[in-house]
Amino acid sequence: MTVLAPAWSPTTYLLLLLLLSSGLSGTQDCSFQHSPISSDFAVKIRELSDYLLQDYPVTVASNLQDEELCGGLWRLVLAQRWMERLKTVAGSKMQGLLERVNTEIHFVTKCAFQPPPSCLRFVQTNISRLLQETSEQLVALKPWITRQNFSRCLELQCQPDSSTLPPPWSPRPLEATAPTAPQPPLLLLLLLPVGLLLLAAAWCLHWQRTRRRTPRPGEQVPPVPSPQDLLLVEH
């Protein structure tokens, strides 16, 4: 008896490949119908923080974009990667505490986040700060986790580089700027009152001389002596 295999068309193979690829990679629709954040996440984080050495070195991103919707989710993505890394070097007791915290932020793996960009810079800090920031992000995200769609947050973004930022102060446009009058020298300001006083004194002296030479109404002007009169006076 011969059993015939079903005939598979190229379209069928293509559909199967699409289904497999979508199942292997995270969904592009980053939204949550039910809150993945438990009500006692702060207790789990505090228990881990109390057990860990407070000065255990980790790294946090220093130039993540301050995006209102995506910023908190991006920091949880990086924190979740640290939880996975710490579990590989922790003892059995520590692994249990790390796994409890990791469970609280593991929901970020349900979204197909892109690898961190090369522009992202990291600075060293201690584990207590990382856990504190994780708790703060969960507190801020919990009321909105089921109300927002985070599909546009799948690519972590860096802050603009300092070389591309505008200067901290820039002058107004020329058409909106009134021309500035040149500042007079200080010496000119000091000499100006003296010059005005001298000018006033000269004017008063000139006025007094003019007044003496001008006869008043009814006043007789003495005749100007002739040369003969001057000779008689001399003899």
UniProtKB/Swiss-Prot annotation:
The chain crosses the membrane at residues 185-205. One of its GO terms (cellular component) is plasma membrane. GO terms for molecular function: cytokine activity; receptor tyrosine kinase binding; signaling receptor binding. InterPro entries: 4_helix_cytokine-like_core (IPR009079), Flt3_lig (IPR004213). One of its GO terms (biological process) is signal transduction. Disulfide bonds join 30-111, 70-153, 119-158. Residues 1-26 form the signal peptide. Glycans are attached at residues 126, 149. Residues 213-235 are annotated as: Disordered. Homodimer (isoform 2). PANTHER family: FMS-RELATED TYROSINE KINASE 3 LIGAND (PTHR11032:SF1), SL CYTOKINE (PTHR11032). Stimulates the proliferation of early hematopoietic cells by activating FLT3. Synergizes well with a number of other colony stimulating factors and interleukins. Required for the development of B cells, and dendritic cells (DCs). It is linked to Immunodeficiency 125: An autosomal recessive immunologic disorder characterized by failure to thrive and chronic diarrhea in infancy, and recurrent bacterial, viral, and fungal infections. Patients have severe human papilloma virus (HPV) infections with disseminated common warts, and the bone marrow is hypoplastic with low levels of CD34+ hematopoietic stem cells. Counts of B cells, monocytes, and dendritic cells are low in patients blood. This is Fms-related tyrosine kinase 3 ligand.
